[in-house]
């Protein structure tokens, strides 16, 4: 199975709705590693996902809807070179 890396920017009503915690739970369930954090604009969540292509794709599909209470307007996905740099999935501080 090919490993991939995706850098996501999820925009809309995605802060204050447990988006980061929910994404972490979904990522761990599918064996995806990386991180997620809020952006200081108040309407963007950023994430980097690494893992098998099908597992990363499942997390991206989930991100298009998000948890209850979220209203996702846009998901930008930038495919990057796989680095294998993560041991787990973390919630990082807001930037």
Curated annotation (Swiss-Prot):
It holds the Pfam family Acylphosphatase. It catalyses: an acyl phosphate + H2O = a carboxylate + phosphate + H(+). Keywords: Hydrolase. Residues 5-93 form the Acylphosphatase-like domain. The active site is at residues 20, 38. Its EC number is 3.6.1.7. Signal peptide: none annotated. GO terms for molecular function: acylphosphatase activity. The gene is acyP. Transmembrane segments: none annotated. The keyword Hydrolase applies. This is Acylphosphatase. Belongs to the acylphosphatase family.
């Amino acid at each position: 199975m090919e490993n991939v890396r995706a850098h996501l920017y999820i925009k809309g009503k995605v802060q204050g709705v447990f988006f980061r915690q929910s994404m972490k739970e979904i990522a761990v369930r599918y064996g995806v590693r990386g991180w997620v954090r809020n952006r200081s604009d108040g309407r963007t969540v950023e994430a980097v996902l690494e893992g098998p292509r099908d597992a990363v794709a499942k997390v991206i599909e989930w991100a298009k809807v998000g948890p209850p209470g979220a209203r996702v307007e846009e998901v930008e996905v930038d495919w990057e070179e796989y680095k294998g740099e993560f041991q787990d999935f973390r919630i990082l501080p807001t930037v």
